[in-house]
Amino acid sequence: MSETEAADAESGVETYEVAVVGGGPAGLSAGLYATRLGHDTVVIDRGGGRAAMMLDTHNVIGVTEDVSGNEFLSTASQQVEEYGGDVVRDLVTDIERTDDGRFRLGGNSTDVIADRVVLGVGFSDERPEPPLPRTGKGLHYCLHCDAYMFIDESVYVMGANEAAAHVAMIMLNFTDEVDILTRGDDIEWSDETQQLVEAHPVDVIHEDIVGMNKRDDGWLESFEFEDGTVREYKGGFPMYGSNYNTDLA
């Protein structure tokens, strides 16, 4: 045993060759590869994330669409563990370089040292103000994942920025019933984008949302607006940006 290994053992700190921060698809994939390559690996996951919100899994080869996000992540975690990796539930709050060039990761209950660190921490979507339907049942953040389910359905895109306008244009490939809901915010897109919006069958609704109605199965049925109108939608996409979890980088 080297002096470093002896010191680690004496301190009681767990040591690994690879520590992966983040237990979404990216982090678990990194953990699985590292473990199968023979590296002593730990995946530290705070929980939550986009994948955990999925009611059904789409666009993943070999995974049937009746698999929920939580089931998908659970299976991936089991795969890491079956090959000898550790999966720990904790929020990593600090990473610092040690004197010998390794990394010490601290969390609410975690204290580990690793030769290498992989950050798979993802990002968090900005949620609009309520009232809102349930995520996955009328409120959707991934256009590539969920646009297909709205073929020939009434769809909203929430926001007043360039992204909202361009997502509305994309949704016209799936349905001819697309509204942009600015919720009273000032338009931020360019004059060129305004011309694009005006040239397509998209309604821009400026009144804010004051109420919401759901169907018996929990899906969104309609929004109520401050001018008294009620508009029916199957679902839609809020476009308020994302916060990338880069604090540890």
Can you name each region flagged by the protein language model?
Residues 2-3, 9-15, 33, 46-70, ...:
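Conserved N-terminal glycine-rich FAD pyrophosphate-binding loop of Rossmann-like flavoproteins
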Residues 2-18, 87-153, 237-239:
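FAD-binding core/adjacent interface of flavoenzyme oxidoreductases
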Residues 10-41, 142-186:
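Rossmann-like dinucleotide/flavin-binding elements
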Residues 29, 33-34, 117, 170, ...:
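Hydrophobic/aromatic ligand-binding patch that stacks against planar heteroaromatic rings
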Residues 54-69, 102-104, 152, 174-183:
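Helix-loop-beta segment of a Rossmann-like dinucleotide-binding subdomain
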Residues 80-106, 111-114, 175-249:
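A Rossmann-like FAD-binding core segment of flavoenzymes
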Residues 127-128, 166, 246-247:
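Glycine/Thr-rich phosphate-binding loops of Rossmann-like dinucleotide-binding domains
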